[in-house]
Amino acid sequence: MAVQQRKKKEGRKSDKNAPSVPQVDASLDKPLDIDAPPTIYSVNLKPEYGTAALNLSADFIRQEQALANKYLFFHPVILVVLTIGLLIYLTPRIVFPIRNTGSVAGWFYQLARINKKVVLSGLVFTAIGASFLFTLLSRVSDSYFKSKINQLVGSKGEKVFGINLNDLVARHETKDPVVNNTHIIVYRETPIALISLAPNMTLSTDENLVMSVTTVGCRRVYVKSGIIEDLIDWAMLHSKNIRSSGKYGETMKLLIDVYSFDSTLKEILKKKGFTYIQSIRVSENRLLGGLFGVKKELWGLQFHFKAEHKD
């Protein structure tokens, strides 16, 4: 038996020398092929989808960065800074009306008329300041999310998918069951969405299986199509199947991390029965987690199963 196992391992090593599997087009900057049949289907993490899976996961992080930029720009701290800056600019330059107009509306009309050029220049000054702040904030968020992408790429996807994607692509087939924990949606022969799960070894026990969503998302244009809801449904069903195939107790949990500014995903989770558990401030970036209060929230869904009695 030991000899057979050794031969299997040697066989796996030899697979790495085999030519890589041709990859499905993974470009995210190209429109879908209109000549391809308009069919939609799902697959697990097959070797030919390795590059596409990595690209999609990185794109999900960039989408989170875009949401973070929007959150930062309209944050109360930034709005207060811009308002104070505008007041500091206008206060010494504004000329107040001398004549009594007899009405509040008339007084404000004269105020605006007299200070028309000053107000316009103040708005230009504010726009320049806002542009500077937006550039600065974009760099702050870029450094944080770029580090997340670097971690994903540096681990060859193993951090998210539980398998080295380079090794997966180098094989023409894989029997590793971990590939079944990833669900990819393909439309017009192009991967457009995916979700991946992994057992949470820290929280799982013999009595309680805990599964964690490691990545979930879709191409930006399909966010409002309901495809995220379908991915969450698959995650719930797949988690139940894993629990059924193992020797676990009567409870199971499905967990997912969500950024505090991602209101769209949180609304979807609420509809699916998930509840907020806890949150922690982003510690890798002091500005994001400290000044702007960006948090990573943990949401979860708990399942209860009836005990199976065997005669």
Curated annotation (Swiss-Prot):
Residues 1-70, 139-311 are cytoplasmic. Residues 1-31 are annotated as: Disordered. Pfam families: Pho86. It comes from the Eukaryota. GO terms for molecular function: unfolded protein binding. One of its GO terms (biological process) is regulation of phosphate transport. Residues 92-117 are extracellular. The chain crosses the membrane at residues 71-91, 118-138. One of its GO terms (cellular component) is endoplasmic reticulum. Involved in the uptake of inorganic phosphate. This is Inorganic phosphate transporter PHO86. It comes from Saccharomyces cerevisiae (strain ATCC 204508 / S288c) (Baker's yeast).
